[in-house]
Amino acid sequence: ALPICNNLLSAGYVGGNLPLGKLNVYAGVRFEYNRMELVSHTQKNEESPTSVFYTYDDFFPSVNAAYRLNDKHQFRLSYGRTVNRPEFREVSSSVYYDFDLASNVQGNYNLKPAYIDNLDFGYEFYPSSGELISVSLFYKRFKNPIEWTYTVSGGTDLIYSYVNAKGADNYGVEVDIRKNLDFIGMRNFSLSLNGALIKSKVKFEPGAKEKDRPMQGQSPYLINAGFFYQHADSGWNAALLYNRIGKRIIGVGRSLGTADNEVRVPDSYEMPRNAVDLSVSKKIGNLEIKVAVRDLLAEKVSFKQFEETRHGKVEQITRQYK
């Protein structure tokens, strides 16, 4: 059964803008008070007689500076702190079945919020109205990132759960391009391209058995593309979208058992796949009719494990589905 839960979030924000000629600086800070109450059920559907409370008091500063060379060129530098607080099911001991993973999932009472410090530096070029070329460098520092992992229930049954890593660092480069296609005679058509290269590394406690690896859920690259048609007079709009992500860890492996009888569950990876979506819409007065088709290629979703042996890595396909 699902847990009984209540959530209270109160927040306040103060900020100010400081224009200094070509340089504009905006800074602010947000305060949040969050109180979560959780009453879980056991696997036998028995309700706990007491509530568990999670209370957080957090400040989130942010600074955004933009230096405008002229109407078409500018540099940006920004910093901000954000948070990823556990969801109710992530801290509940109740077990639920995840159909995508084809496995049971159980929360972790001791899960902590993850705090992220974000730093970005970028250059932006606006060739004309609605067009953009930007290149940015980014760095993200994670404290207590929340990750999927495995645990044991009922003796030998493996189920998914959540844990906090000590920390993680992500950094990389991102390119964003938006271009109208009038210059090749394709009026009302536009193209967008977005790509990122990311290096990710998790930090571990001294003496931990884990090796260097990317953060769970983080891909080494991301590719997005879009082909758009917009005709304001007729009200017709269409979009063809493409997406691809690199191989990423979907479940963090761990060592189980004693030192004399230790079993290592390898990391589980979601393999790259291509996804294409199509949508067409028509405006009729104040109404809009829209038809959308997702995942036109219908490529299989594959999860694999790579186990290291004395002879090298052994690849094993653990699950595939469409």
Where does each model-flagged region fall?
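Extracellular loop and loop/strand-boundary signature of outer-membrane beta-barrel proteins
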Residues: 1-3, 44-52, 104-109, 158-165, ...
